[in-house]
């Protein structure tokens, strides 16, 4: 009865989500989005145009839920739900990374990512999904993070990173875990804790917080900021996101600080307050170091690490030596969700320009809100579709290759854990001499800490600072 299951699920979601119902009806097929999708640009497949990808779903909608479709059938652009249609859904809705670049150019503001979310949710009802989405989601349900790491192991890994990083400045770092009464709960994607190169970003957080004396704690239960429910099911997204609020309430913190992640921030900025809020038990975030009130986080009670760090720099609370990053020629990749779903555009650039002397922008067309996707977001970072991923990443790779050749760029910075995982494959294929790094990693490189050892000659990756190797 798979057809019945999908049809019933379709009806329920049309009734529940007003935006989905609206998006099914208002598209005029103008084609403004057609050449904005990286997968269409590189494949030339018309069904990878956002408008025609959505038509795969709309055609069934017309057939089952509109009078014109029921009467006129194919003359109204309607078609029945068959197994071939389901196969098309699987093929094309898993070639959408939910990056929302097409939505920027849509004159009606249609969010094609939400159409993809609904299509995947319908497929999931009949057991059609991919392991790279389901496995992390199941792990997060079971242990609180995508990798399925138990609380005691999470704590041990952080302590190991502390041991590794303490030798660089020569200063003891003192993170706390599950500490009740801390002012701030810090939550970051598990990729920053367990995956290279994300671990260097985690080291950067630890050094930064120690330097400013931040009263924060980590949770071994809400040990994941990312949310694979966004790629799979609204109910699962709500469930996974709830753990952050529940843990913040249990620990009695004032507000939440979030690390460098992508889809984590779309969920927080666009869905969190209505899904799991209001978080009346938390306070409107105020920096304990500068006194700045983060008014944009008034409802969610959660602040992005780039906003927090940019505010520290603006108020002269960090002593920085940008020359410590002179061995890096840096460009910046605007991660889709922080950029388009949250508007974090200038803060990372402001931070980078204050901690690096050599920063070069990619061409204007594929950056900021027009940024091209890494090619493997929304759970598509899986080996068996590597050929599709590399094609999808070509527009971003082309811009990267341009600045690499023009400015000898050797570092691609980003503020997304999935980017730090997916861009490794991209750079290895398209730009082998370029490393991928988090912005907070470079902040820690430049950070002049109180009481640090007299000669600090290596960065977080144990690479010598420029001139030291001589």
Question: At which residue positions do the language-model features occur?
Answer:
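Short cysteine clusters
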Residues: 27-33, 37, 96-102, 106, ...
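Iron-sulfur-cluster electron-transfer modules
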Residues: 15-21, 54, 58-291, 461-470
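Cofactor-cradling patches in redox/metallo enzymes
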Residues: 109, 193-291, 337-354, 360-470
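Iron-sulfur (Fe-S) cluster-binding segments and ferredoxin-like electron-carrier domains
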Residues: 35-63, 104-123, 379-393, 421-432
């Amino acid at each position: 009865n798979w057809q019945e299951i999908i049809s019933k699920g379709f009806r329920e979601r049309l009734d529940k989500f007003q935006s989905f119902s609206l998006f099914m009806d208002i598209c005029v097929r103008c084609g403004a989005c057609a050449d904005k999708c990286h997968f269409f640009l590189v494949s030339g497949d018309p069904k990878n145009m956002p408008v025609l990808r959505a038509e795969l779903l709309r055609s069934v909608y017309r057939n089952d839920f509109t009078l014109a479709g029921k009467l006129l059938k194919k003359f109204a652009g309607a078609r029945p739900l068959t197994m071939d249609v389901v196969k098309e859904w699987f093929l094309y809705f898993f070639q959408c990374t939910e990056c929302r670049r097409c939505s920027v150019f849509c004159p009606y503001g249609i969010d094609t990512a939400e159409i993809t979310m609904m299509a995947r949710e319908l497929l999931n009802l009949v057991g059609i999904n991919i392991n790279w989405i389901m496995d992390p989601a199941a792990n997060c349900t079971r242990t609180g993070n995508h990798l399925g790491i138990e609380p005691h192991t999470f704590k041990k890994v952080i302590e190991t990173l502390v041991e590794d990083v303490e030798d660089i400045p020569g200063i003891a770092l003192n993170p706390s875990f599950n500490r009740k009464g801390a002012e701030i709960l810090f939550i970051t994607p598990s990729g920053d804790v367990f995956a290279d190169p994300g671990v260097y970003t985690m080291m950067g957080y630890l050094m930064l917080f120690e330097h400013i004396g931040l009263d924060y704690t980590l949770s071994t239960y809400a040990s994941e900021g990312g949310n694979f429910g966004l790629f799979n099911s609204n109910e699962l997204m709500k469930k996974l996101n709830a753990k952050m609020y529940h843990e913040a309430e249990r620990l009695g913190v004032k507000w939440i600080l979030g690390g460098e992640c992508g889809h984590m921030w779309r969920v927080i900025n666009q869905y969190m307050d209505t899904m799991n809020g209001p978080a009346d038990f938390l306070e409107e975030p105020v920096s304990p170091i500068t006194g700045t009130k983060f008014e944009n986080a008034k409802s969610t009670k959660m602040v992005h690490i780039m906003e927090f760090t940019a505010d520290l720099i603006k108020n002269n609370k960090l002593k920085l030596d940008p020359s410590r990053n002179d061995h890096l020629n840096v460009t910046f990749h605007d991660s889709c969700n922080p950029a388009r779903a949250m508007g974090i555009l200038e803060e990372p650039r402001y931070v980078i320009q204050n901690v690096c002397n050599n920063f070069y922008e990619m061409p204007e067309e594929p950056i900021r809100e027009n940024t091209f996707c890494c090619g493997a977001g929304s759970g598509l970072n899986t080996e068996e579709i590597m050929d599709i991923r590399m094609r999808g990443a070509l527009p971003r790779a082309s811009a990267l290759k341009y600045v690499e050749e023009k400015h000898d760029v050797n570092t691609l910075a980003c503020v997304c854990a999935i980017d730090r995982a997916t861009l490794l494959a991209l750079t290895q294929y398209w730009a082998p001499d370029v490393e991928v790094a988090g912005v907070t990693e470079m902040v820690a490189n430049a950070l002049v800490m109180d009481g640090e050892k007299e000669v600090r000659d290596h960065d977080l990756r144990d690479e010598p600072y420029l001139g030291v190797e001589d």
